[in-house]
């Protein structure tokens, strides 16, 4: 550390504490991190250096003296009988070697480690009494967490009852897999909601929901890795993990008992290379002394256990050059900048574009054409510019000028109150019309097969459609004007458009593209009020009275339906013969242990109690996806009499088989 005076150290430490407190609060309490982990870690390490050199500047409230963030939420507070401490971090193999030497010196001999993957999620404690799950809680500040028991009951791999009547506490990590994360963000995009930046944020936001039904839909998972105060006959970490597996807990099977640094470094190298191919996010490797008696003798500091350490992966970054900044117009008029760059390989994929989100973000980063930038993937998934390499900025560089006019229609762009986004508010903007019609025809909405973005673009270019109602006035002669459209393509598209008239009204509401109103909100509203005429007559309070709808959606819907243009278009749709009624089933009674929620199910054989169509609808109402073929992704096969090849294939693949009666018994 460079020479620094006591006064300078005090001043710098104070600034660092304030900044770190702000970042920690955003990360732990709001699930909305403001900086990447490596930036936080660098600042935290600097504060530790200062406090080590000048012990007199350490304050009791310094973030180095506590765990996590302060608790500020609507959840019941839970005091941890044994603190849930965080881990010390190292960022190089040399530091890991120093840790090993320190352990050997403290213990007096070489030690064996249980080496595990560091899962990128949030810490979770599970407490059982007489084998029954009684409480689940988050880490919080390490001493006081939040009671999330109601939500934890909807995480599929958390056992609600143990095979033995034990009173125990186990701890682990709650996470969201990459596939579930991608699915959730796709759903949120379709519903006009902001997407999560990474799986860790998504997991934290999903577990800390006031409505457990939201958690239930989010497909969270756990890895359990700690047994708090295990029985005396369990003397090591790996024995504890094996026993927890036997009790039904989901543990990570990649962990290994290793004795030498060479083996540990090989493990690190292996998973540094494999991390992109894993189904879940990891941000490092954890070393724990395997012998529990040694762990107990070493104990903890005020903040971290002495006997374990986390090796953090360095962020994978690539440098590339910004060649252009393009602006795209979404269906709601939001205009978004995207950096177009020289292609680079990053975390297993080729990346040539990264969102710049909004004008404030672009200006804050000060990204310019010709800049060399550092690119990484937030949460190993979303390409993001981390910084501009100023030393490589061209000498003739000039600040980027935010456009004043819409790139599609030339209309003046505006900032609406309380929004950082730029918007085009021209309802006839070709880009918005194109996006709106494409959305209307998409699978979550009216599901008009064959009507994709390229066809929509041609329809607009040929002046055949100006809004979604015009789709229902198209003729074979109109479609014959499109490129590569022959008789078969024309007939198929006209049939698909005609079939969409029969859709239940919630699909029409989804397709209208009303701000903040996605498929879920549309279904809830249609279930409640049954037809579009009734819905259009409602006030804000009527709509907001529906559980999970809220004022934002209610105000957006009433504003939309108050527009004369919207009323005219809906009247045109009704005149064209579109169904305006809710045709679905009422929301079924919630079944706490519903085994078919978010599962893929196949029906085979002759059923006795239901027709195939009736049972399919029943399963879909319970949240199942019913498909016609058996694959490795199938979760259950329900069979009746004379079951054939599907039954045999399920047996070969080891997929659970249920008789019709067994399936019915589980959903009564």
Swiss-Prot record:
Residue intervals of the BRCT domain: 591-668
HAMAP family: DNA_ligase_A (MF_01588)
Protein EC: 6.5.1.2
Cofactor(s) needed for function: Mg(2+); Mn(2+)
Keyword flag Metal-binding: yes
Active site: 118
GO biological process terms held by the UniProt record: DNA repair; DNA replication
SMART domains linked to this entry: BRCT, LIGANc
InterPro entries noted in UniProt: BRCT_dom (IPR001357), BRCT_dom_sf (IPR036420), DisA/LigA_HHH (IPR041663), DNA_ligase (IPR001679), DNA_ligase_AS (IPR018239), DNA_ligase_CS (IPR033136), DNAligase_adenylation (IPR013839), DNAligase_N (IPR013840)
Protein name listed in UniProt: DNA ligase
Catalytic activities: NAD(+) + (deoxyribonucleotide)n-3'-hydroxyl + 5'-phospho-(deoxyribonucleotide)m = (deoxyribonucleotide)n+m + AMP + beta-nicotinamide D-nucleotide
Pfam families registered for this protein in UniProt: BRCT (PF00533), DNA_ligase_aden (PF01653), DNA_ligase_OB (PF03120), DNA_ligase_ZBD (PF03119), HHH_2 (PF12826), HHH_5 (PF14520)
Organism of origin: Lactobacillus acidophilus (strain ATCC 700396 / NCK56 / N2 / NCFM)
UniProt cross-references to SUPFAM superfamilies, sorted A to Z: BRCT domain, DNA ligase/mRNA capping enzyme, catalytic domain, Nucleic acid-binding proteins, RuvA domain 2-like
NCBIfam families associated with the record: dnlj, PRK07956.1
GO MF annotation: an example: metal ion binding
Residues that, per the record, bind NAD(+): 37-41, 86-87, 116, 139, 173, 288, 312
């Amino acid at each position: 550390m460079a020479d620094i005076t006591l006064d300078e150290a005090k001043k710098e430490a104070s600034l660092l504490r304030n900044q770190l407190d702000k970042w920690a609060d955003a990360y732990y309490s709001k699930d909305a991190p403001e900086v990447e982990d490596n930036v936080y870690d660098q600042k935290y390490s600097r504060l530790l250096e200062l406090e080590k050199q000048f012990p007199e500047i350490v304050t009791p409230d310094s973030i180095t003296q506590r765990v996590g963030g302060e608790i500020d939420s609507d959840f019941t507070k839970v005091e941890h009988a044994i603190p849930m401490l965080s881990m010390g971090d190292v960022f190089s193999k040399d530091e890991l070697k120093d840790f090993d030497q320190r352990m050997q010196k403290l213990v007096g001999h070489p030690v064996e480690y249980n080496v595990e993957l560091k899962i990128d999620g949030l810490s979770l404690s599970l407490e059982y009494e007489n084998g029954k799950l009684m409480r689940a809680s988050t880490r919080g500040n390490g001493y006081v967490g939040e009671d999330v028991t109601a939500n934890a009951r909807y995480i599929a791999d958390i056992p609600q009852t143990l095979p033995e009547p034990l009173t125990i506490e186990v701890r682990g990590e709650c996470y969201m897999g990459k596939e579930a994360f991608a699915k959730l963000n796709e759903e949120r995009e379709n519903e006009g909601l902001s997407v999560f930046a990474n799986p860790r944020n998504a997991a934290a936001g999903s577990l800390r929901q006031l409505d457990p039904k939201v958690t239930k839909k989010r497909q969270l998972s756990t890895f359990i890795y700690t047994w708090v105060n295990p029985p005396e006959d369990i003397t090591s970490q790996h024995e504890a993990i094996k026993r927890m597996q036997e009790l039904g807990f989901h543990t990570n099977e990649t962990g290994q008992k290793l004795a030498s640094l060479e083996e540990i470094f090989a493990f690190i190298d292996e998973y540094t290379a494999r991390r992109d191919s894993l189904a879940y996010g990891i941000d490092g490797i954890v070393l724990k002394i395997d012998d529990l008696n040694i762990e107990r003798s070493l104990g903890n500091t005020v903040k971290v256990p002495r006997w374990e350490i986390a090796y953090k992966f360095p962020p994978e970054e690539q440098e590339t050059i910004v060649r252009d900044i393009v602006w795209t117009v979404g269906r709601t008029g939001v205009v978004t900048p995207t950096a177009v760059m020289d292609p680079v390989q990053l975390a297993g994929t080729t990346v040539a574009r990264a969102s710049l989100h909004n004008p404030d973000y672009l200006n804050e980063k000060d990204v310019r054409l010709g800049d060399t930038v550092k690119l990484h993937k937030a949460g190993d998934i979303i390409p993001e510019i981390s910084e501009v390499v100023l030393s490589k900025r061209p000498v003739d560089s000039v600040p980027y000028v935010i456009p004043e006019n819409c790139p599609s229609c030339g209309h003046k762009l505006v900032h609406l109150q309380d929004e950082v986004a730029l918007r085009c508010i021209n309802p006839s903007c070709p880009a918005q019309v194109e996006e709106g019609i494409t959305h209307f025809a998409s699978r979550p909405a009216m599901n008009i097969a064959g009507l994709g973005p390229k066809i929509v673009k041609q329809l607009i270019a040929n002046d055949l459609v100006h809004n979604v109602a015009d789709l229902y006035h198209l003729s074979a002669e109109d479609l014959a004007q499109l490129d590569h459209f022959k008789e078969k393509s024309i007939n198929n598209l006209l049939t698909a458009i005609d079939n969409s008239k029969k859709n239940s009204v919630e699909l029409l509401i989804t397709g209208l593209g009303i701000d903040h109103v996605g498929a879920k909100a549309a279904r809830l509203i249609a279930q409640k009020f049954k037809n579009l005429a009734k819905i259009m007559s409602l006030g804000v309070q009527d709509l907001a009275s529906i559980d999970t709808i809220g004022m934002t959606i209610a105000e957006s819907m009433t504003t939309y339906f108050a527009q004369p243009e919207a009323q005219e278009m809906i009247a045109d749709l009704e005149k064209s013969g579109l169904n305006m009624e809710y045709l679905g089933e009422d929301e079924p009674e919630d079944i706490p242990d519903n085994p078919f929620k978010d599962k893929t199910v196949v029906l085979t054989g002759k059923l006795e109690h239901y027709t195939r169509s009736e049972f399919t609808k029943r399963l879909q109402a319970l949240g199942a996806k019913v498909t016609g073929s058996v694959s490795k992704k199938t979760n259950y096969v329900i069979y009746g009499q004379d079951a054939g090849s599907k039954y045999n294939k399920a047996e070969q693949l080891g997929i659970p088989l249920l008789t019709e009666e067994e399936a019915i018994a589980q959903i009564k």
